Amino acid sequence: MANHKSAIKRHKQSVKRAARNRAVKTRIKNAIKAVRTAVTEKDKEQAQAKLTDAMSVLDKASSKGVIHWKNAARKISRLSKAVDGIE
């Protein structure tokens, strides 16, 4: 364990941030999974609704710095392409 007061504080902050980041990443995975499920079921309306939710979650995560903005853009692009491919 850290000996300096500032190091102890930094450790507490890093633990808090790690927990927050983990929660956001879980939310991202669940949103993406929901879109993929709707795409495999070929339910276009539900897929588009879930895509909107996923885009929101990804944009928020990238603006908070949890994931890189290009990573978010890539995921959104691939999900959009999958939803547009539904006939």
Curated annotation (Swiss-Prot):
GO biological process terms, semicolon-separated: translation
GO molecular function term, any single one: small ribosomal subunit rRNA binding
GO cellular component, one term: cytosol
Chain segments annotated as transmembrane: none
Alphabetical keyword list: Ribonucleoprotein, Ribosomal protein, RNA-binding, rRNA-binding
Keyword Heme: no
Region (Disordered) residue spans: 1-23
Task performed by this protein: Binds directly to 16S ribosomal RNA.
Family matches, as PANTHER family: 30S RIBOSOMAL PROTEIN S20, SMALL RIBOSOMAL SUBUNIT PROTEIN BS20C
Annotated family: Belongs to the bacterial ribosomal protein bS20 family.
Protein name: Small ribosomal subunit protein bS20
Source species of the chain: Oleidesulfovibrio alaskensis (strain ATCC BAA-1058 / DSM 17464 / G20) (Desulfovibrio alaskensis)
